[in-house]
């Protein structure tokens, strides 16, 4: 709405009646009068101050453009005189005297301001009780929120918090609620713009709004704890050793519907202070080494779930089962080994060979199984190099040393 403000500092004189409506506004100690269109509301052809479809409206447009006619000047001066008399109530700071129309209006001639082709009218201000006056529709915040929830478009999504400053200008509500739209701005952020012909209404977040992933393919990461239990008799742990019931983080990666589980490789610490008699001196077979570990250090940080955690060497080397026979101080890591050892002291041999004509008996079941191979001729242990077979595993271990240290190297060592 365009307001034409005219300062009432000059002296005007006219006995005619006003035309149109009045809006008085006081700024400080100076009185201003707001001049709307003097044309009637019922005249649809002259509903805009800029439309010139009738002689009266043409005269009004000419006075806005700077060329005032005598009749239009008289009507405006009559309107200002009567309204100033009613508004001031006899106590206005401006005095009304005799002055000619063209001389009084001349200093305030200016070019017409660009206005929209719409008709605006100011409400009347009666002198009665202000509570009884019908006021324009002003919705509350609850009504606006309900309207937005019912009529918000599904394409409108929640805007990130960093762009809240950009949406402050769009959050002012007008008298009638309207829908708001989001358009991508030139700087990469989202900006709010009102629909054509109306003001924007605040609220850029729908009831089910969420962030819209417009970037690359989403990758979902989920961390799950995996408990790793240790034996209860491990004793005091060193500073570099993990405590009991350690939870190792398991990472689940979901890429395009396919889930991959990654777990860190548990590398045994090298700073274990163990007695020398518990240290293994036998070489570890190549196939028994964990994947990814080499002489230069551990392998990659993550392995697939198919690989098992390597056992803690400290838990394997600690012998907690001690022989109670007088004069014997042997200790074993397993109770079954201790029971087999006690049979040697007692002389008990419960495992007997069932081969015809053989009456051998043994205190351990593995000894009986090894003895049966001597009757059947089965040799399950085969050398991977020369494919030679053996009935006992210890015989195979001794044979592998031949391939590790050939006869030529051994002969050279003996000569040196």
Swiss-Prot record:
Its main location: nucleus. Keywords: Activator, DNA-binding, Metal-binding, Nucleus, Repeat, Transcription, Transcription regulation, Zinc, Zinc-finger. Belongs to the Sp1 C2H2-type zinc-finger protein family. Residues 156-219 are annotated as: Disordered. A zinc finger (C2H2-type) spans 321-345, 351-375, 381-403. Residues 156-168 have a biased composition (Basic and acidic residues). PANTHER family: KRUEPPEL-LIKE FACTOR 15 (PTHR23235:SF44), KRUEPPEL-LIKE TRANSCRIPTION FACTOR (PTHR23235). CDD domains: KLF15_N (cd21580). It is found in: Nucleus. This is Krueppel-like factor 15. GO terms for biological process: cardiac muscle hypertrophy in response to stress; cellular response to peptide; glial cell differentiation; intracellular glucose homeostasis; negative regulation of peptidyl-lysine acetylation; podocyte differentiation; positive regulation of D-glucose import; positive regulation of transcription by RNA polymerase II. Residues 199-212 have a biased composition (Gly residues).
């Amino acid at each position: 709405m365009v307001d034409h403000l005219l300062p009432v500092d000059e002296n005007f004189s006219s006995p005619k009646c006003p035309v149109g409506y009045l809006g008085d506004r006081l700024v400080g100690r100076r009185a201003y009068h707001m001049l709307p269109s003097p044309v009637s509301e019922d005249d649809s052809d002259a509903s805009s101050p800029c439309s010139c479809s009738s002689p009266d409206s043409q005269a009004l447009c000419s006075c806005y453009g700077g060329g005032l006619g005598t009749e239009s000047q008289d009507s405006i001066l009559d309107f200002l005189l009567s309204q100033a008399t009613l508004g001031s109530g006899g106590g206005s700071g401006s005095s009304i005297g005799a002055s000619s129309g063209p001389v009084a209006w001349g200093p305030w001639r200016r070019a017409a301001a660009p206005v929209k082709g719409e008709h605006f009218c100011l409400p009347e201000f009666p002198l009665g009780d202000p509570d009884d006056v019908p006021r324009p529709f002003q919705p509350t915040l609850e009504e606006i929120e309900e309207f937005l929830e019912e009529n918000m478009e599904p394409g409108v999504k929640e805007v990130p918090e960093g762009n809240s400053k950009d949406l402050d200008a769009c959050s002012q509500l007008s008298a009638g609620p309207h829908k708001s739209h989001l358009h991508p701005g030139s700087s990469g952020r989202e900006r709010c713009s009102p629909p054509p012909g109306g003001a924007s209404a605040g609220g850029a977040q729908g009831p089910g709004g969420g962030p819209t992933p417009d970037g690359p393919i989403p990758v979902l990461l989920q961390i799950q704890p995996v408990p790793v239990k240790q034996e209860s008799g491990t004793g005091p742990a060193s500073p570099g050793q993990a405590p009991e019931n350690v939870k190792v983080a398991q990472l689940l990666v979901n890429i395009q519907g396919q889930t991959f589980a990654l777990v860190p490789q548990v590398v045994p610490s090298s700073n274990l202070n163990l007695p020398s008699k518990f240290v293994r001196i036998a070489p570890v077979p190549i196939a028994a080494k964990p994947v990814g570990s080499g002489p230069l250090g551990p392998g990659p940080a993550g392995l697939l779930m198919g690989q098992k955690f390597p056992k803690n060497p400290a838990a394997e080397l600690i012998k907690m089962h001690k022989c109670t026979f007088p004069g014997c101080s042997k200790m074993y890591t397993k109770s079954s080994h201790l029971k087999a050892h006690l049979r040697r002291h007692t002389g008990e041999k419960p495992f007997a060979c069932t081969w015809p004509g053989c009456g051998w008996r043994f205190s351990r079941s593995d000894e009986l199984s090894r003895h049966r191979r001597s009757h059947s001729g089965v040799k399950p242990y085969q050398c991977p190099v020369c494919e030679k077979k053996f009935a006992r595993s210890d015989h195979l271990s001794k044979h592998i040393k031949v391939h590790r240290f050939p006869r030529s190297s051994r002969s050279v060592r003996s000569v040196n």
